[in-house]
From Swiss-Prot:
Basic and acidic residues biased stretches: 866-880
Protein name: Catenin alpha-2
Compositionally biased intervals (Basic residues): 881-891
Tissue note: Mainly in the nervous system (at protein level).
Single GO BP term: epithelial cell differentiation
Region span, Disordered: 866-892
GO CC entries: actin cytoskeleton; adherens junction; axon; catenin complex; cytoplasm; cytosol; nucleus; plasma membrane
Topological type in the membrane: Peripheral membrane protein
GO MF annotations, alphabetized: actin filament binding; beta-catenin binding; cadherin binding; structural molecule activity
Record key words, sorted: Cell adhesion, Cell junction, Cell membrane, Cell projection, Cytoplasm, Cytoskeleton, Developmental protein, Differentiation, Membrane, Nucleus
Subcellular localization(s) per the UniProt record: Cell membrane; Cytoplasm; Cytoplasm, Cytoskeleton; Cell junction, Adherens junction
Length: 906
């Protein structure tokens, strides 16, 4: 770093012809094009045409001469105006003039005799010399611009030194005002230079340095003022020196970026993808070998060493404090058994295929298995990291607020105790951020996270110093202002780090972990409620609120990346329900519970109300996750399939239970159903096809009606959709993962069936036709029966048997029973819809619409697609319709309904 009195040093070799700005490149490009075109005029070999003068070559030579003249005029002007590098610029202009004259003569002679190789060679050498001279002139002009920027930097450095040497607060105010003016000028010049820089890395460095300068300038005044007001408090000097150092480093950053010099070693450490991610990527590449050249002695030690290095990194992550026990077990199992065994199997297959030209099927299968196991390990590691992120980036401002409150009270001992907590919190943020980087392939995102983490690491001690200053002088407004500035800076930096970490992690992983953590916290709340532990209840409920708020914030931000449509509407509807309905109810129940438990004489309250409110929070987050996953591909859903509900040890008789007892090897019930034998899958597919035929009947029926004002149609559609999800589950597809999901779906169908029963019975009660009424009631009995059957069959699960050490999966009977029950229910719903309509028509026909109460539901045909007002029709069709109308034949409602054809667009 140059001092305020040192001369300006340009870290740039004047003899270098490296182009560093877009402007030089743009100015040079036309001349390069013209010279290249001229040189290549006769580059196609000897011509059979008569030798003579080339008109094209003369035109090109004239254009080169004119372009050179333009450069000379601009060069003369720059040399006259420039205060820096004046001698070098004048010399460069003369060199361009000299080389331009040489080029003019050589190009003219070449144009007169374009077939002469000697003259062409002379012109090529002259062209190269001219381009070098012009390039050097432009680069010197560019260097002159950099010198002007460095002059501004020197002025700012001097103003900064003046601020540092201020002797009183008034002197500080005056000097800081001057510093601010010079800062504005510097920012303008630096911004222009940033736009001109050719290297994206240098542009990023310039932007970062400008941002750091602006950010620290805010703290510069309050830190200096606090030092002048309380020089006896050591923490004030530490604050001031830190800010001055940050400003000086920002100025140095602008200088380096402007000259496009190499980044510092510190910045080099920020580049590149995560270490563990890079190791896994390299391992995946190294396992693809040529059997012809495979040598066990050469490749086995190398691959085993690489894998052990990966396993060591995974073990460190597994042993970290925030990693859940079950996650740790999964990672260890994945490393010790699955991945190592897959590598040994792969090496064995390579040995069997040694010397062959083509890879055999067993070898390809072994490669796929190895790749799948490393992919599974990646997922487990991402999930472990997300455990840390979910816990550490929750209520990030609490340690800071506690520290500030202690400082305001003037209790220095307490401040030192809370400072240790704050320091541990900051260290945890940095540690978790680095963990997130270690498994990320997002190079740019990793760089941002590491830079933000570095800022957090350096800012943490200064926040503590500001708190110590306030604790020593709690009545001082200057100390309070200084604390506020550092507080604001800390909160901004934490937000930057949080957003950067969110950018390199998966939303799907975040939602999966958040769902499991909220379930864990809900169960803790229930246990605390039963044990009367108010502190644990309050703290855990706060964690639930924080997790839910994070989910809402992240998903709302994620939806901004999508075009507005049905998908985003569904997701935002789920987040809105959680934020505006579910969370207020949960907060209310927590308050009621805490008040009741905190009373001198514990007051009775409805425990089930609290449990229901807690369950709704979990369901709300789960619904958001389901909505987000709606557009995922089957492969992406498969990647998420092994992240099921956690098997927590903490349980109580009233805690929220959502786990499945049939999970094996960390797989979901849906994933197990997908592993059924092909014969059973084929039979299930036949049953599903029959179900789809029944579904098409219901689709045709409900498509006829406008569902506004007709809840029977709405309920029929809902039941149809849920039944489709249940049948998809039997094929190992769809949004339902576990038996608990299928059971919940069956409950929803039963609820919808009960509501349909209530509505249809109201229709039947108003129907005067006893036959229609009896038919409708009979169909309703079928719905009740089939809903009950579906509830029983919803406990579908694949049976897993261990025969000879091999897992045999079967589940045909339970799957076909579920599909059959769904088909029967679908048929009953179709008949109920038809019978409800018929009963409604009988009712209106006998009593008339004016003499009765409003109908239970409104049966209106869906409006047809818009068509031309005048339609050309064949005469015979027109006559036929008139004759049919004139017969006045009575048509029963059922017949009319069956003849009605819904259009595809309905």
């Amino acid at each position: 770093m140059t001092s305020a009195t040192s001369p300006i040093i340009l870290k740039w070799d004047p003899k270098s012809l490296e182009i560093r700005t877009l402007t030089v490149e743009r100015l040079l490009e036309p001349l390069v094009t013209q010279v290249t075109t001229l040189v290549n005029t006769s580059n196609k070999g000897p011509s059979g045409k008569k030798k003579g003068r080339s008109k094209k070559a003369h035109v090109l030579a004239a254009s080169v001469e004119q372009a050179t003249q333009n450069f000379l005029e601009k060069g003369d002007q720059i040399a006259k105006e420039s205060q820096d590098l004046k001698e070098e610029l004048v010399a460069a202009v003369e060199d361009v003039r000299k080389q331009g004259e040489t080029m003019r003569i050589a190009s003219s002679e070449f144009a007169d005799d374009p077939c002469s190789s000697v003259k062409r060679g002379t012109m090529v050498r002259a062209a190269r010399a001219l381009l070098s001279a012009v390039t050097r002139l432009l680069i010197l002009a560019d260097m002159a611009d950099v010198m002007r920027l460095l002059s501004h930097l020197k002025i700012v450095e001097e103003a900064l030194e003046a601020v540092k040497n201020a002797t009183n607060e008034q002197d500080l105010a005056n000097r800081f005002k001057e510093f601010g003016k010079e800062m504005v000028k510097l920012n303008y010049v630096a911004a222009r230079r940033q736009q001109e820089l050719k290297d994206p890395h240098c542009r990023d460095e310039m932007a970062a340095a400008r941002g750091a300068l602006k950010k620290n300038a805010t703290m510069l005044y309050t830190a200096s003022q606090a030092f002048l007001r309380h020089p006896d408090v050591a923490a004030t000097r530490a604050n001031r020196d830190y800010v001055f150092k940050q400003v000086q480093e920002a100025i140095a950053g602008i200088s380096n970026a402007a000259q496009a010099t190499s980044p510092t070693d510190e910045n080099k450490g920020h580049t590149g993808i995560g270490e563990l991610a890079a190791a896994l990527n390299e391992f995946d590449n190294k396992i693809i070998l040529d059997p012809m050249t495979f040598s066990e002695a050469r490749f086995r030690p190398s691959l085993e060493e690489r894998l052990e290095s990966i396993i060591s990194g995974a073990a460190l992550m597994a042993d970290s404090s925030c990693t859940r026990d079950d996650r740790r077990k999964r990672i260890v199992a994945e490393c010790k058994r699955a991945v190592r065994q897959a590598l040994q199997d792969l090496l064995s297959e390579y040995m069997n295929n040694t010397g062959r030209k083509e890879k055999g099927d067993p070898l390809n299968i072994a490669i796929d298995k190895m790749t799948k196991k490393t992919r599974d390990l990646r997922r487990q590691l991402r999930k472990a990291v997300m455990d840390h992120i979910s816990d550490s980036f929750l209520e990030t401002n609490v340690p800071l607020l506690v520290l500030i409150e202690a400082a305001k009270s003037g209790n220095e001992k307490e401040v030192k105790e809370y400072a240790q907590v704050f320091r541990e919190h900051a260290n945890k943020l940095v540690e978790v951020a680095n963990l997130a980087c270690s498994i990320s392939n997002n190079e740019e995102g990793v760089k941002l996270v590491r830079m933000a983490a570095t800022q957090i690491d350096s800012l943490c001690p200064q926040v503590i110093n500001a708190a110590l200053t306030l604790a020593a002088r709690p009545q001082s407004k200057v100390a309070q202002d200084n604390m506020d500035v550092f507080k604001d800076q800390w909160e901004k930096q934490v937000r930057v780090l949080t957003e950067a970490v969110d950018d390199i992690t998966s939303v799907d992983d975040f939602l999966s972990v958040s769902e499991n953590h909220i379930l864990e916290d809900v169960n803790k709340c229930v246990i605390a409620l039963q044990e009367g532990d108010v502190d644990t209840l309050d703290r855990t409920a706060g964690a639930i609120r924080g997790r839910a708020a994070r989910v809402i914030h992240i998903i709302n931000a994620e939806m901004e990346n999508y075009e507005t449509g049905v998908y985003t509407e569904k997701v935002l509807e789920a987040t809105k329900l959680l934020s505006e309905t579910v969370m207020p109810r949960f907060a209310e129940q927590v308050e009621v519970a805490i008040e009741a438990l905190s009373a001198n004489v514990p007051q009775p309250f409805e425990e089930n109300e609290f449990i229901d409110a807690s369950r709704l929070v979990y369901d709300g987050v789960r619904d958001i996750r389901k909505a987000v996953l709606m557009i995922r591909t089957p492969e992406e859903l498969e990647d998420d399939s092994d992240f099921e509900q956690e098997d927590y040890d903490v349980r109580s008789r009233t805690s929220v239970q959502t786990e499945d007892d049939q999970l094996i090897a960390g797989q979901s019930a849906r994933a197990i159903m997908a592993q059924l034998p092909q014969e059973e899958k084929a039979k299930i597919a036949e049953q599903v096809e029959i179900f789809h035929q029944e579904k098409s009947k219901l689709d045709a029926e409900v498509a006829k009606w406008d569902d506004s004002g007709n809840d029977i149609i709405v309920l029929a559609k809902q039941m149809c959709m849920i039944m489709m999800e249940m049948t998809d589950f039997t094929r190992g597809k769809g949004p339902l993962k576990n038996t608990s999901d299928v059971i919940n779906a069956a409950k929803k169908i039963a609820e919808a069936g009960s509501r349909m029963d209530k509505l249809a019975r109201a229709v039947a009660d108003q129907c005067p036709d006893s036959a229609c009424k009896q038919d409708l009631l009979a169909y309703l009995q079928r719905i009740a029966l089939y809903c009950h059957q579906l509830n029983i069959c919803s406990k579908v699960k694949a049976e897993v048997q261990n025969l000879g050490g091999e897992l045999i999966v079967s589940g045909l009977d339970s799957a076909t029973s579920l599909i059959q029950a769904a088909k029967n229910l679908m048929n009953a719903v179709v008949l109920t819809v038809k019978a409800s309509y018929v009963a409604s028509t009988k009712y209106q026909k006998v009593y008339g619409t004016a003499a009765v109460n409003s109908p239970v539901v409104s049966w209106k045909m869906k409006a047809p697609e818009k068509k031309p007002l005048v339609k050309r029709e064949k005469p015979e069709e027109y006559q036929t319709r008139v004759r049919r109308g004139s017969q006045k034949k009575h048509i029963s409602p059922v017949q009319a309904l069956s003849e009605f054809k819904a259009m595809d667009s309905f």
